[in-house]
């Protein structure tokens, strides 16, 4: 199947310079390999509010999986490569960096300096989750969103652990609430149990399921049409 990067270069890249404002999109591994549709939708939304979308010169995995498994040296190499591209985007191209993954954004903003000892103070505030970026534009009155009025649905929102640490769940929730005819249920979220790569490991399966049990019960009880979250591993 086609990666998001391949799709973007073939179908979207050529038209992005037509917009008056621009951002760089840190898509991450999940969008690139597992769910390109989310990346395509992100491009559509940003284009709709007048922003051209560009890829970073070189994007590596944010490194969170390496950090979680103690592979600090490898994670540091990837972080340094990402920050080189981020600095080029921000300082040379004058483009802030947005992402759709709370985990990737938290890692790049907070875990690079705290866990890897890499100074990102010069760019940290220009690395942002897309929902916060869009919310700020709406609050400033710079853009307006147009919605279809023929969609009625019940959505349950789960706050991921990294989103909780960022303190940015408010922005995703506010955007969902702004959609007409959406009945939004904000779950009393605890960890889903996957905990990065922890829950992928066979020996951790029972513990992982136990951690997520409360969240799973809530999701079943609210019987929503969709469950929304900003984290790929929670999904």
Where are these regions (language model features)?
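Iron-sulfur cluster-binding electron-transfer modules in prokaryotic oxidoreductases
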Residues: 1-235
């Amino acid at each position: 199947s086609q990666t998001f990067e391949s799709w973007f270069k073939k179908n979207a890249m050529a038209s992005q310079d037509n917009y008056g404002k621009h951002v760089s999109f840190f898509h991450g591994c999940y969008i690139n390999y597992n769910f390109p549709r989310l990346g395509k939708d992100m491009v559509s939304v940003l284009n709709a509010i007048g922003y051209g979308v560009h890829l970073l010169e070189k994007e590596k995995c944010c490194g969170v999986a390496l950090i979680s498994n103690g592979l600090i040296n490898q994670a540091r190499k990837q972080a340094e490569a990402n920050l080189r591209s981020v600095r080029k985007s921000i300082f040379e191209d004058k483009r802030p960096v947005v992402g759709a993954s709370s985990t990737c954004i938290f890692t790049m903003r907070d875990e690079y300096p705290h866990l890897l000892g890499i100074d990102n103070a010069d760019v940290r505030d220009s690395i942002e989750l897309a929902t916060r970026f869009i919310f700020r534009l709406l609050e400033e009155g710079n853009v307006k969103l147009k919605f279809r009025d023929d969609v009625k649905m019940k959505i349950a929102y789960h706050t991921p652990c990294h989103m909780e640490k960022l303190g940015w769940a408010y922005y995703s929730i506010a955007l969902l609430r702004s959609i007409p005819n959406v009945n939004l249920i904000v779950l009393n979220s605890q960890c889903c149990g996957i905990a990065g790569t922890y829950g992928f490991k066979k020996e951790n399966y029972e513990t992982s399921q136990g951690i997520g049990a409360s969240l799973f019960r809530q999701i079943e009880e609210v019987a929503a049409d969709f469950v929304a979250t900003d984290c790929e591993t929670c999904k």
